[in-house]
Amino acid sequence: MAFGPDGILFVGDSVGATVLALDTDDRKSAKSGGSFELKGVNTKIAALLGTEPDQILIQDVAVNPLSKKVYISVSRGRGPDAVPVILRADSSGKITELSLDKIKHSTVSLPNAPDPSAKDRRGQSLRLETITDLAFVDGKLIVAGLSNEEFASTLRSIPFPFAEAGTGAGIEIFHGAHGRFETNAPVRTLVGYNINNKPHILAAYTCTPLVTIPISELKPGSKVKGATIAELGNRNRPLDMIVYNKDGKDYVLMANSSRGVMKLPAARLDSYEPITAQTDKQGVPYETIASLKGVQQLDKFDDAQALMLTDDGGSLDLGTIALP
């Protein structure tokens, strides 16, 4: 999920190979200086949906930048029969379901998604990777994921209001940890950022290359080579990434499956020589924020705070923290 302008919530449907734009009608600006805390959100959601905590899966969270309400994508049940639900939580802790019955919406189809029967070498469905992340950047929706093209790793730049999605751009990167060029690994998380006053995508991949890609090159049918500006360590999956400014300097904050939460300087990202040889760690330096543990989801809350979903011994907690 990702928010666009005026309370529009973009939701990806990999199985259906579509992206929905939902008008949440949630445009009232929140007062500045607020925070958010909701402990045991998995238990509260399970009670709301009439099931047990082990029968729900929180897929994503997104903060409405206007109202500061938190939108939560949930699967009720496990496996192929799981039912998707979108919930909305406010600062008082109240959770309600976002009714989709009469909601104003538009959709765009992704024409060259992986076949529903396609599997990777581990036997996992490639169709479920049709959409791996979304970001609204410079008036366009950027959709990361896989396609059925030769360069399966795909980024689509889709104008909003929606026009046709097109086939997207095939992405090639050099993966330093693997020592080779790759075209089949999908972007796991991305964020928009201006480099030399030009809109770029910062994209992170499994095991953990960090790559810059100019948005202007994301034309349907094109093949684009990203610049790998950092290798942040293998055996890791990046989960979420935000950009923020603190004390006049820009930073990237990245949550990871097994390497904690990383803080990286965003200044002069174009000054790092692209990685083109096998390496373990190289490029943009980072520090690990030792106090942030068990982070599963991350989004920007406001200019001073981030929202995190953390696992505290089985209890999933939603809360804001001061940006480090």
Range-by-range predicted roles:
Residues 2-324:
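Sequence/structural signature of beta-propeller domains
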